């Protein structure tokens, strides 16, 4: 998009620990299985595949429909990551990349965000500067591109967006059930449905 008409805002990258029960391949299988990942990102919406490209880089385009919205989205795989781009009718484009980070190849000090050490996944994030253990982390990198008249009204949300919360919940469930994706997605959908019944709202950025 031309920067003359659009403005982009980026959030700080964040790392979230992945259960030691999961391997790099376990997580990659989730990130690169677009049909499953679309259910993780939009568990209560209807997703329809518009176009699927199986050559490198693998990509899938969807329409994502819920009660009041009908957006376009795309998932694109990279070697150790996946990028999700979602566009709304207002011309807003939300982009988030999830990347697997192995702590053995990263600096000794980094900001760690762990939503599973709080009372529940809906609690506020604990953020601490700690030496990295030898384990895997999920890196979240996100940005928002909007037409300049709207960009001044848009703010990047603090904390994990809904897609990130869903993905972390899904991975945690996989770590408990032997990497069974079907059971993990069923648990996620049940959790999201229950949260909706209790009136939890999602923000525009999610």
Residue ranges and their predicted role:
Residues 85-165:
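Beta-strand/loop substructures that line and gate deep hydrophobic ligand-binding cavities in soluble
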Residues 55-60, 104-114, 118-128, 170, ...:
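Noncatalytic linker/hinge segments flanking ATPase motor cores
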